[in-house]
Amino acid sequence: MRTVQTIAVIAGLLVSLGASPRNAIEPLPRDLEIQLALSALPPHLRDAATVYVLNPARGFEVARPGTNGFHAFVARTGDDAFRGEWPLTKYRDDILYPIAFDNAGAKAQMRIFFDAAELQAKGTPAAELKRIMQQRLKAGFYPAPARAGVAYMLSPVLRTYVNPDANNTVLTANVPHVMYYAPNVSNQDIGGAQPKPGSLYPFVILRGPHGYSIQFLGVTETAAVNREYGDMLARLCSVKQAWCLPTSSPTSNGR
């Protein structure tokens, strides 16, 4: 019995050491991570969606299987980190990217997030990860969605890169929105608005095979989301100051 216990302890230690310390990101409390992931979806899709949590030693794992074809998770290194020429010198611990894909997106864009998380967990340095992912994206390793579809980012909080094609500035934002797949479509093609928080009109981001047309929720709808998730927002703010929302503007904590 003692031998079995010893083996179990050693196995546990090996698993815990699976992710390089410099790559490991402190995971969110499991219940908070699941709640945040599901907040990306509209209410009628939450109960039957598949939910994933991030295991720093392995990557994303299913926390709750679903039946409706939607997949929700919280990325801590987003696909936007692989845009632009700026160097990804380290893994940030403040990125918070709740997103949910339909089945079309799960076979396309979602693979980018999941492969990146797995490589990060295996100890791939940040700069090397960006190089690998950019090469894969350029080579068409990740296909564009096979059909029209949607990704939801209706969570009341998002912290990620503002304009990743240009620089690595990060911002916390309260901008619940819906993203429609728009492969190889430009903002000019759709007569898009100026891409900025609070825009009333759609615009294109991440132009290319994995581009999206963005539509923000209105002021009234956003306020309702904020009220629904007030306790969750307070809890996130207590975990990390960078995740605290502002009181008078849709963005904060930019750097």
Named regions from a protein language model:
Residues 7-16:
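Bacterial N-terminal signal peptides
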Residues 1-6:
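Positively charged n-region of N-terminal signal peptides that target proteins for export
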Residues 22-255:
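Primary mode marks residue(s) on the alpha4-beta5-alpha5 output face of response regulator receiver
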